[in-house]
């Protein structure tokens, strides 16, 4: 008895590799619905394979450390919030488990929000250790954004429940005695930094959403403190609040 297209599709969707798909008995079924199902499954498998290859590439720097130091405890560090006109700069320090496998990890700005939230929950529940560090708008104004970012990163490291032995940092160097590697675009090149990027992004977005409840005019829940049209119009209308960065333009020129 010939299987229905729905039944064949279920069989096809259970296939786990492209090779298996091409050798499947249904591969030669010429019905359009079956061929469409095969094409969809191939596309999904190709996407999954690309994510796996990307993930392997992003473990390069971790593996280089582990070659020389098999017992290394590697901490990835990243920040979000250097560019906004309001709110803190937030850093996260993350130590992944040895058997980590978080397909889709990348620079948090490139990860769709649904996937970002999914990864964040998995990371919070499964990593060896993580901690956040915050530098306030006042500290940003006092020290400058670069120094404030360093402060936030060090606070995140200090907050870890497990002491790392090596640091992988996104485009920064820290005054820290631990061996460290600074990587330009590290959140797209290292799984440890990418994990920290995701966690810092979700934490800061949540913070700004909460802030918007007290200051709804600025639209922080949508712009995260960046200088959008709504945000700038609100500043012109009602002025600034305590979490605005007075050293950032155009706010600086308004004072």
UniProtKB/Swiss-Prot annotation:
Record note on cofactor: Manganese or magnesium. Binds 1 divalent metal ion per monomer in the absence of substrate. May bind a second metal ion after substrate binding.
Residue span(s) of domain RNase H type-2: 72-255
EC number assigned by the record: 3.1.26.4
Alphabetical UniProt keywords: Cytoplasm, Endonuclease, Hydrolase, Manganese, Metal-binding, Nuclease
Cellular compartments annotated: Cytoplasm
Cofactor(s) needed for function: Mn(2+); Mg(2+)
Record-level GO cellular component terms: cytoplasm; ribonuclease H2 complex
Catalytic activity: Endonucleolytic cleavage to 5'-phosphomonoester
InterPro entries: RNase_HII, RNase_HII/HIII, RNase_HII/HIII_dom, RNaseH-like_sf, RNaseH_sf
One GO MF term: RNA binding
Keyword RNA-binding: no
Function of the molecule: Endonuclease that specifically degrades the RNA of RNA-DNA hybrids.
Protein name according to UniProt: Ribonuclease HII
